[in-house]
């Protein structure tokens, strides 16, 4: 099993880091590539991540041709022939995001069968919003033996109100509605940048979607879609992770290709702490004098609130800031598991339901730790950089789902870090 080894203590991260295409954008784009019955789809700026390989295999399992040119960060999808309607269990079970193929398969074929998905263990994350929305559009849904089966000769436009602005459900329903008969309105829709990117992608294909980035989406169904070329939006969570890394280490880092507007909630909290964040021609520069930073209170919320996918990394920053900071996690339950591992490194914290109190500013010590999910992996590595001594981060299967060559990028910025596959 691979592990990351960090010699921490006095590292100051400096230099430039290039941000990859967004994992959370490319996965639904691959699902949407199921929809076109004409032409090929080409995705550029694709990150080389295990989740991308998994989604490629989910799509291939539908008898769709998928070619991944890793050297060019480019995927070509040809779904123009007959496609199957059952997604392969062995791949769907590995990744939560794979549920978003349900809507496209159903819209394209009139029938779909998808296994209950897997992924990080950070809460129950029910899929009822996906299923309720499809039922509102006329689908008959059955769940049996761990499988979800959906049937609809042709989906019908509907008015859908979502009890929570779920990103995955918004994506699934928006894709399904592109080929529905009539107009579909989704109220309380997710507003994340990845939703906007997906809507732009679908509109290029011939879909008619209005309101992406707002609470109300309006989709007028069409009879068919065609393949297109598209550049995947930059990964705001990877960008945010390196912003936090610079802030934790009194660093001076230019995060190339980072999009200011996509990272506004995080940038606001960094500035409140006393971090210097400036927009430059080629990206965002973060500079900090960590001992002078101030504690803050943060609450995770759906976009445009503070992203839950930055919660773990930001609590790592709170750990090195003098004073008591508070993190309130409102999106997922069970997402403070990394704090238990950070306590092995000397962190003092208390957790009461959805609130974590972080007593920061004490010198942390290196220790062997176990990553529990994707963003926790990054948080533990960043903590290892500032901790005195050697930190070993185990269970990197989560890290590889969302970060490409993370240790190499940190090493180029000055961290003493390596990856080992020794037992």
From Swiss-Prot:
Catalyzed reactions: phosphoenolpyruvate + UDP-N-acetyl-alpha-D-glucosamine = UDP-N-acetyl-3-O-(1-carboxyvinyl)-alpha-D-glucosamine + phosphate
GO cellular component terms, A-Z: cytoplasm
Signal peptide: none
GO molecular function, one term: UDP-N-acetylglucosamine 1-carboxyvinyltransferase activity
Annotated compartments: Cytoplasm
Top EC class for this record: transferase
Active-site residues (renumbered): 120 (proton donor)
Annotated UDP-N-acetyl-alpha-D-glucosamine binding sites: 96, 309, 331
Modified residues (2-(S-cysteinyl)pyruvic acid O-phosphothioketal): 120
Binding site for phosphoenolpyruvate: 23-24
InterPro entries, per database record: Enolpyruvate_Tfrase_dom, Enolpyruvate_Tfrase_sf, MurA_subfamily, RNA3'P_cycl/enolpyr_Trfase_a/b, UDP_GlcNAc_COvinyl_MurA
Keyword DNA-binding found: no
Listed EC numbers: 2.5.1.7
Keyword vocabulary terms for this entry: Cell cycle, Cell division, Cell shape, Cell wall biogenesis/degradation, Cytoplasm, Peptidoglycan synthesis, Pyruvate, Transferase
Presence of keyword Cell wall biogenesis/degradation: yes
One annotated GO biological process: UDP-N-acetylgalactosamine biosynthetic process
Transmembrane residue ranges: none
Coiled coil: none
Function: Cell wall formation. Adds enolpyruvyl to UDP-N-acetylglucosamine.
Family note: Belongs to the EPSP synthase family. MurA subfamily.
Name of the protein in its database record: UDP-N-acetylglucosamine 1-carboxyvinyltransferase 1
Organism: Streptococcus pyogenes serotype M3 (strain ATCC BAA-595 / MGAS315)
Gene name of this polypeptide: murA1
């Amino acid at each position: 099993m691979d592990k990351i080894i960090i010699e921490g203590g006095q590292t100051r991260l400096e230099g430039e880091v290039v941000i990859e295409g967004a994992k959370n954008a490319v996965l639904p784009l691959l699902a949407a590539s199921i929809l076109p019955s004409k032409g090929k789809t080409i995705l550029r700026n694709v990150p080389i991540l295990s989740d991308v390989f998994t989604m490629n295999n989910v799509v291939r399992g539908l008898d769709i041709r998928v070619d991944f040119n890793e050297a060019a960060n480019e995927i070509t999808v040809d779904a123009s022939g007959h496609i199957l309607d059952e997604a392969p269990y062995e791949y769907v079970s590995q990744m939560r995001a794979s549920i978003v193929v349900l809507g496209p398969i159903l819209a394209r074929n009139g029938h779909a069968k998808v296994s209950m998905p897997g992924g990080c263990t950070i809460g129950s994350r029910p899929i009822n919003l996906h299923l309720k929305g499809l039922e509102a559009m006329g689908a008959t849904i059955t769940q049996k033996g761990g499988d979800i089966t959906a049937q609809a000769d042709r989906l019908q436009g509907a008015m859908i109100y979502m009890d929570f602005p779920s990103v995955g459900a918004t994506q699934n329903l928006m894709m399904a509605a592109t080929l529905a008969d009539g107009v579909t309105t989704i109220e309380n829709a997710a507003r994340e940048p990845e939703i906007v990117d997906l809507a732009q992608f679908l509109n290029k294909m011939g879909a008619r979607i209005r309101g992406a980035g707002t609470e109300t989406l309006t989709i007028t169904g069409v009879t068919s879609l065609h393949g297109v070329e598209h550049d995947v939006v930059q990964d705001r969570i990877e960008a945010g992770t390196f912003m936090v890394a610079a802030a934790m280490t009194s660093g001076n880092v230019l995060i190339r290709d980072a999009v200011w507007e996509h990272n506004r909630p995080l940038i606001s909290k960094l500035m409140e702490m006393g971090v210097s964040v400036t927009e430059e021609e080629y990206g965002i520069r973060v500079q900090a004098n960590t001992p002078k930073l101030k504690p803050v209170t943060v609450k995770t919320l759906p976009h445009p609130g503070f992203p839950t996918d930055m919660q773990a990394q930001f609590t790592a920053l709170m750990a090195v800031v003098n004073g008591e900071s508070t993190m309130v996690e409102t999106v997922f339950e069970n997402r403070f598991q990394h704090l238990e591992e950070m306590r092995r490194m000397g962190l003092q914290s208390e957790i009461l339901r959805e609130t974590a109190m972080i007593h920061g500013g004490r010198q942390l010590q290196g220790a062997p730790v176990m990553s529990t999910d994707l963003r926790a992996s990054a948080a533990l590595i960043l903590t290892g950089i500032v901790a005195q001594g050697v930190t070993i981060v185990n269970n990197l299967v989560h890290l590889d789902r969302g970060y490409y060559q993370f240790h190499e990028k940190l090493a180029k910025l000055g961290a003493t870090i390596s990856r080992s596959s020794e037992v």
